[in-house]
Design a protein with these regions (language model features):
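C-terminal catalytic lobe of FAD-dependent flavoproteins
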Residues: 332-456
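Flavin-dependent oxidoreductases
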Residues: 51, 208-335, 348-359, 364-372, ...
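Dinucleotide-binding Rossmann-like beta1-alpha1 core, especially the glycine-rich loop
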Residues: 81-159, 276-279, 286-324, 460
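Glycine-rich FAD pyrophosphate-binding loop
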Residues: 57-77
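Glycine-rich Rossmann-fold phosphate-binding loop(s) that bind the pyrophosphate
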Residues: 44-46, 68
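Flavin (FAD/FMN) cofactor-binding and adjacent substrate-gating region
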Residues: 3-21, 105, 117, 126-201, ...
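Extreme N-terminal leader/targeting segments of oxidoreductases
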Residues: 1-40, 58-59, 455-458
């Protein structure tokens, strides 16, 4: 559970909140001891890892899910909770569309509650160029079977009446929605256990064993699991893990800060993106406030190593990505150091990445949200938090088998988009592992594009 929340106010200063875990996560009773063998080992208990393990178990495979800390405790519980097709990069749109179907199907099949609902997502703007961009995206989306509605000035102003002002235009995607980051990953892990899969928390994967030129086991702090297939869904830790295997996987982790405020008597829109801030209503009535793409790039050895590949991304997002501090060095998730398989690793010293929120980012997010929705002025700040977004040079994930390590499937670099597309990504990865026909084309996600410097344009957040 979260530590008790306390509020500190220096005389004449604004209220600040100590860093906390986002919300109490569902506590799963799991075995600390992994099995001696499994058909597949999934490394990482975030939304990608749990859905991958779930779909593998549905195919009758024995699956061991290994998590160094708690299921869903890092970025999978620190995001907005949006599950969207609207404004998706073309490379991710098929994954997003199928994911919405799979969110619904998961609830029906498992009986578990992820908090998913198709509440619709509302975007408002006074920027004519942005509105024109949405209209252009809509033309493309129609060819992909996506329903989205452009809003005139009067329609946008009516849907956005809680803002108390008029708008030039907007867009509404009725089939999109949100899920609850505090519930989702633990719910999927619980469904995995019902299917016979095993989940092992506080059990870090330290590395792999090879035999006959391919993966033969996953070494954990509690022993080795013999297997012929493994999935690395390690989020912000994936690149440093790959480095242990002499695999170059460029990641930059961006520290994003989020504000959560208490419920209000007036019900505000379920999911609203204004010109420079987004507000999301959670099932418990609290509101989550965030600025899309805003964060701090904490300098680390890994960031310096991959900096040249991220120049296009930082050039595109320079207005929102700011230089950070030593927070990244403190956690060790971007180390270039090699670790031993028979000794504690950085992952065991930092079971849960819980970085400090950026005070300036918190203040600016709160200010913008109140300007967008004046009613939020009456809502007290419940807590703030930060998380590390694992971003690739083009903002599109890397999914595929690593040729240097046959049998190891990489699934990381979801670049702040991973929560909503978790079901589709998990299904695709399960297809790759089991040799089934892919649910959609995996080619845009091939990690080999980074080795060849052949990635495409930088995706939007």
């Amino acid at each position: 559970m979260n530590p008790p929340l306390t509020m500190h106010r220096a005389q004449g200063a604004a209220t600040t909140m100590p860093p906390t875990l986002p919300q109490p996560l569902r506590l799963l009773e799991t075995s600390p001891t992994p099995p001696a063998s499994a058909d597949v080992v999934v490394i990482g208990g975030g939304i990608i890892g749990v859905f991958t393990a779930y779909y593998l178990a549905k195919r009758g495979l024995s699956v061991a899910l290994i998590e160094k800390g708690r299921i869903g405790a890092e970025q999978s519980s620190r995001n907005w909770g949006w599950c969207r097709q609207q404004n998706r990069d073309a490379r991710e749109l098929p994954m997003a569309t199928r994911s919405l179907e799979l969110w619904d199907q998961f609830a029906a099949d498992s009986g578990e509650d992820t908090g998913f609902k198709r509440c619709g997502l509302l975007y408002l703007s006074d920027d004519e160029a942005q509105i024109a961009g949405w209209a252009k995206w809509r033309e493309f989306a129609i060819t992909a079977g996506v329903t989205t509605h452009m809003l005139s000035g009067s329609e946008a102003s009516e849907r956005g009446r809680a803002t108390g002002r008029a708008w030039k235009g907007g867009v509404f995607s009725p089939s999109d929605g949100t899920a609850d980051p505090a519930k989702a990953a633990p719910a999927v892990a619980a469904a995995l256990i019902k299917l016979g899969g095993t989940v092992h928390q506080n059990c870090a994967a330290r590395g792999i064993e090879m035999e006959g030129g391919r993966l033969s086991g996953v070494v954990t702090e509690a022993g080795t699991i013999k297997t012929r297939a493994a999935v690395l869904a390690g989020g912000a830790w994936a690149s440093s893990f790959c480095n242990q295997l002499d695999v170059r996987f460029p990641l930059a982790t961006i520290r994003q800060s989020i504000v959560r405020v208490a419920p209000l008597a007036q019900q505000l829109p379920a999911a609203l993106a204004g010109p420079n801030v987004a507000v999301t209503r959670r099932p418990d009535g609290h509101y989550v406030l965030a600025i899309s793409g805003r964060g701090r790039a904490d300098p680390t050895p890994q960031l310096l190593r991959f900096a040249p590949q991220f120049i296009p991304m930082f050039a595109k997002r320079w207005r929102n990505v700011f230089p950070g501090g030593l927070e990244g060095m403190r956690w060790g998730h971007e180390t270039r150091a090699r670790w031993k398989l028979d000794a504690p690793t950085p992952m065991e010293r930092a079971r849960i990445l819980n970085p400090t929120p950026d005070p300036a980012g918190v203040r600016e997010t709160h200010r913008r949200a109140i300007k967008l929705l004046p009613a939020l002025r009456e809502a007290r700040i419940a807590n703030t938090w930060a998380g590390y977004i694992d971003s690739t040079p083009d903002g599109v994930p890397g999914i595929g088998e690593l040729p240097q390590v046959p049998g190891l499937i990489l699934a990381a670099g979801f670049s702040g988009h991973g929560f909503g597309i978790g079901p589709g990504a998990g299904h695709l990865i399960a297809d790759i592992v089991s040799g089934a026909t892919p649910i959609f084309d995996p080619k845009p996600f091939d990690p080999a594009r980074f080795n060849a410097s052949a990635w495409g344009k930088v995706a939007d957040f």
